[in-house]
Amino acid sequence: GRTFFVGGNW
């Protein structure tokens, strides 16, 4: 999905 921060994918 979208990466908002390192290791944070939705």
From Swiss-Prot:
Report the enzyme's class at the first EC level: isomerase
Q: Which domain of life is it from?
A: Eukaryota
**Under which EC number(s) is this enzyme classified?**
5.3.1.1
Q: Which family does it belong to?
A: Belongs to the triosephosphate isomerase family.
Query: Which pathway, metabolic or otherwise, does it act in?
Result: Carbohydrate biosynthesis; gluconeogenesis; Carbohydrate degradation; glycolysis; D-glyceraldehyde 3-phosphate from glycerone phosphate: step 1/1
What keywords are assigned to this protein? Cytoplasm, Gluconeogenesis, Glycolysis, Isomerase
Q: Which reaction does it catalyse?
A: D-glyceraldehyde 3-phosphate = dihydroxyacetone phosphate
Location(s) in or outside the cell: Cytoplasm
In alphabetical order, the GO MF annotations are: triose-phosphate isomerase activity
Q: Return the GO cellular component terms, semicolon-separated.
A: cytoplasm
Its subunit composition reads: Homodimer.
Additional remarks: In plants, there are two types of TPIS, cytosolic and plastid.
Share an example GO biological-process annotation for this protein.
glycolytic process
Q: What is the lineage of its organism?
A: Eukaryota, Viridiplantae, Streptophyta, Embryophyta, Tracheophyta
Q: What is this protein called?
A: Triosephosphate isomerase, cytosolic
